[in-house]
Amino acid sequence: TLSGALYHQSTFNNLFIEGLSVTAGLRLDYEKISMKYNSLSTPIDFGFDFHMAMGPTQINLSDQNMKAPASFVGKLSTDYVQLLPKFAIQYEWKNQNNVYATVTRGYRSGGYNIQMFSDLSQTELKNSMMNAIKESPTIGQDATWGATIIKMMDQMVPAKEIDVKTSTTYKPEYSWNYEVGSHLTLWEGRLWADVAAFYMDTRDQQLSQFAESGLGRITINAGKSRSYGAEAALRASVTKELSLNASYGYTYATFTDYVITEEKKDSTPIITDYNGKYVPFVPKHTLNIGGEYAITCSPRSIFDRVVFQANYNAAGRIYWTEQNDVSQSFYGTLNWRTNLEIGDAMISFWARNFLNKDYAAFYFETMNKGFMQKGRPMQFGVDLRCRF
């Protein structure tokens, strides 16, 4: 991979009125990706037997000394050039108190699914074996039935054309991102609040899924999607010892143009429409609540400082598939930590998922089966740290 970028950003402060700033930026991105593939192998030895009754005639053909080459050699190269603008406006009426709006264009580079070569090699081997059978003298010398048998083979096991570039390449993902929000400092600088609302239009969205063979994960492009939502966060220094924080996010992400058309063996089209379905792996709600209480010990104490920390992290609902038929409902885990500080050393006692919540951390489907990874159960531990 070869990549490079040119970037410029200008900010105009106190434009028209005190505290108003406008920012404009532009990034020129260039990326060249290339791939060489070489899967040379010794020709496969195989044989075939063909037995069929055609009216009163019994056809018996056999050849057990056949060879089929199975090799894949070539290279691919793709260039991407992108212009990514950025615009922002902010009004700050007091230090650390402002409102803002931004518009940016997002980009995620494309690439190659090298895991697809397992599927492509199998297809190439199948085509090679079928061609070897058709060219076999055993069939070719049968002037009466040879052409009929080859026609039947083409109908029953049609050759599949291989396009390496189309099969392995996934396109870049593009998005337009819009956000408005505010950063506030209140309560004599002891309370910080951040609020934001966002909207995102995404084209050629990249999704991860398993290859048809089940050997390795690949990236696909899933048409268009739309996401919008809001986020809010609070941090408070209640006292010198006690601090609290909380954050919440809501995201509504759905496909707006994602239709897949596949063909059965009889060429009947199968149309799957994902429009309106939720984008997988995007939590609809996220929540975090935490706090810290720090005690400074007296000089006669063994410890210099004792810190108690606790937080509750939650997320859901999370859909695992484009069909939205498997999901994890809203769940949360409680975690805590106690730090005992002695000079440059620290002993920490901690617990994760203290309430032993049962939840799914990941899910995927391959070979028409679903596999779920459960979240870690309740854990306890001790950490020892020393700074030198």
Where are these regions (language model features)?
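Transmembrane beta-barrel architecture of outer-membrane proteins
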Residues: 1-6, 26-36, 79-85, 103-107, ...
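Signature of Gram-negative outer-membrane beta-barrel scaffolds
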Residues: 1-96, 112, 132-134, 158, ...
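Residues on the lipid-exposed face of transmembrane beta-strands in outer-membrane beta-barrel proteins
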Residues: 6-12, 87-91, 170, 180-184, ...
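Outer-membrane beta-barrel strand-turn architecture
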Residues: 12-18, 83, 91-95, 174, ...
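Gram-negative outer-membrane beta-barrel transporters
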Residues: 16, 190-203, 218-321, 385-387
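Flexible, surface-exposed loop regions and adjacent strand-edge segments
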Residues: 38-48, 53-55, 116-124, 209-218, ...
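Membrane-embedded beta-barrel scaffold of Gram-negative outer-membrane proteins
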Residues: 98-102, 121-221, 226-228, 249
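C-terminal beta-signal and adjacent terminal beta-strands/loops
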Residues: 107, 241, 312-321, 336-388
